[in-house]
Amino acid sequence: RAVADWEFLKRLRELWPGKLVVKGITSVSDALQVQECGADAVYISTHGGRQLDSAPASLTVLPLIRQALGPDYPLLFDSGVRNGEDIVKALVCGANMVMLGRPVLYALAADGARGGGRAVQRFSL
């Protein structure tokens, strides 16, 4: 299958009994469509901001998506999270969970477990 569209997501939901989280959502309309297709959560992410230069900032769309989906629908968030303050911002804007990627991976690659530990300390509140 060369394309993943909304019909594919609906069919996947029918076939998959486990939790289904859709990552890469950056618009209210897509988030509402994901919810309508039966996904268990939306993962707001720009995949590191390296896909489209003109894509909206994840933190900008997060509160809009939270408002549209309501207070109880699970929202995961990443993109541009570099310290504890960024985590607080995402939580205040409506995220239920904040995910980390590159900062920890880069630290692990540069200095092994010690580097990873130092990176995690940067995220302490």
Please give the residue ranges for each predicted region.
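Alpha/beta enzyme core
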Residues: 1-77, 84-107, 117, 121
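Active-site-proximal loop->helix
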Residues: 110
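Active-site-adjacent loop and "lid" segments of alpha/beta metabolic enzymes
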Residues: 113
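Extended, intrinsically disordered, low-complexity segments
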Residues: 124-125
